[in-house]
């Protein structure tokens, strides 16, 4: 997803992962003022993300009166240095601006871990055997991608369907309100599947 501003594009990830005005300005080939304007436009276009960022920061630090601190280095006062992840574990926060990134990275990792486990469970429940002497073998798990070798194309189709259902199981497990999906691609090597 991109936000357009006079022909320039900014990746949503830079914003979500805590890029400041200067960094966003640099990404678009501009300056901090232009970066700030892009962020303002983005927040106006998708207020839910701005609200989420503010809610996360409000849970961590006390508000700063920016008018009284203009031009001075401000010191934040922490309420707490942690947030809770999807699995209720404490996530220790380094800085308020990186807190949303921490939540997103944690959620992504937990979702993918659960998805991998549920895929395996579902395939075994279908009577398939895991291993090089069996029907399928997990060759790689990279970020949000599984690479699974299958004995036949029919088994590969089953793996794709079960991986999709495993993702929906994961959505339900974490009570995730956004639909989670995956895409299965069948090929003879990683290049064909990626």
List PLM regions with ranges.
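Conserved catalytic core of nucleotide polymerization and phosphodiester-bond processing enzymes
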Residues: 1-194
């Amino acid at each position: 997803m991109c936000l357009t501003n006079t022909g320039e594009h900014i990746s949503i990830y830079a914003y979500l992962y805590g890029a400041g005005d200067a960094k966003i300005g640099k990404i678009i080939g501009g300056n901090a003022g232009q970066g700030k304007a892009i962020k303002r436009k983005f927040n106006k276009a998708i207020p839910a993300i701005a609200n989420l960022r503010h809610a996360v920061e409000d849970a961590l630090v006390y508000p700063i009166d920016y008018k009284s601190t203009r031009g001075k280095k401000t010191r934040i006062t922490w309420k707490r240095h942690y947030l809770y992840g999807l699995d209720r574990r404490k996530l220790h926060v380094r800085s308020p601006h990186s807190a949303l990134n921490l939540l997103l990275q944690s959620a992504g990792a937990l979702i993918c871990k659960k998805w991998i486990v549920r895929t395996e469970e579902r395939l075994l429940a279908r009577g398939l055997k895991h291993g090089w002497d069996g029907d399928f073998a997990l060759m790689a798990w990279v970020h949000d991608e599984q690479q699974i070798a299958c004995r036949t194309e029919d088994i590969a189709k089953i793996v794709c369907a079960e991986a999709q259902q495993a993702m929906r199981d994961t959505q339900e497990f974490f009570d995730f309100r956004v639909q989670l999906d995956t895409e299965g691609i069948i090929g003879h090597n990683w290049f064909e599947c990626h």
